[in-house]
Structure formats: structure tokens, C-alpha cells
Amino acid sequence: MMKAFSAKGLLIEQNHFQQILLRGRGDGSFAETINKEVSLLPPSDNLRMINNDKFIFAKQSFDQWSLICLEKQSDKEMLRLISAMNANEKILASDYSNTLYFEFTGENKDHYLSKLTHFDLRPKRFPVSTVAQTLIARIDCCIYHLQDKYLVTCHSSFEDYFKNRLQDAINL
């Protein structure tokens, strides 16, 4: 974990997680395969997520899931996980590790993140254990609402631009 930015009541840390993008119907054999490999059952509702100490598992659409590895996996283990999931012909799993991860924590995380997006971060609209796909600083991003923080993801090609926009938001 690398400290990226801080301000009064805000800490933003950049992480280097690994991610697997999954496609499938989410039926019984899908759930069984996923549970066998990562000990999590897939969320049934769109834009919901579940997590444990090792993974965040989110349903991003009716047939797409995102599995984020919170603990560093070896390349061999990532390949094994993807291969085990692809062994089920109803699942298409692919490595999606070209993603940036920023953790927003602190009492003012909503204030600063709101400067970069029009997305409604109020708990009534964006409860804990949900995920949203939205524009942040005009970049297509995902926001994962964990208990006391947000995990914001975007494609690695936007790293410099995203960091510059974060700095701009802090300086406003």
C-alpha cells in the first residue's frame, strides 16, 4: 500500500490488488465453482458486493462479476484460479489486473470524493456493500462502498490524470 494523498480528515492510499473479471449466469454451478475457489457465494442482486479478508466479490451487471484479491497472489496462483473457474463451461474468467485501486478513508472522504463526481454518496442512495459504476473526474470508475471506506478503481492508463484530479480536489 502506498500513501497517495492526505488532507484534513482524508487519507487516500493507492493499492496494487489483482482482479479477475467473470462472466456467467450466476446459477448453481457458477456459485458452486466460485464458492469452492474463494469461499464466497456470488451476490444475487446487481451492484451488490460481499467480501472476506481475502476477496471482494461484486456483481456489476446481470452476467458480470468482479473478484478483487485483497492479498497478493502469485502469478501461478492467479493462473490456477482463472483456470479452475474456466473449467466450468458456464464461466468465462479473465485476468483484469491492469486496474488502479485507491482507498478513501477518513471523516471527509465523502466531501472530497463529491468534488470529483456527481454520484450521490449518501448512505440512503449508496449503502454499505454496494458498488457503483460512475464517472469520477470524467474517468469511468467503480466505487466499492466498504464499511468505513471507499475503494475506487479505474484503468491504469488514467493513473497520472486521476492523481492530478485528486490533487486538484484537495487543493480546492
Residue ranges and their predicted role:
Residues 1-172:
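Basic, glycine/lysine-rich polyanion-binding surfaces/domains
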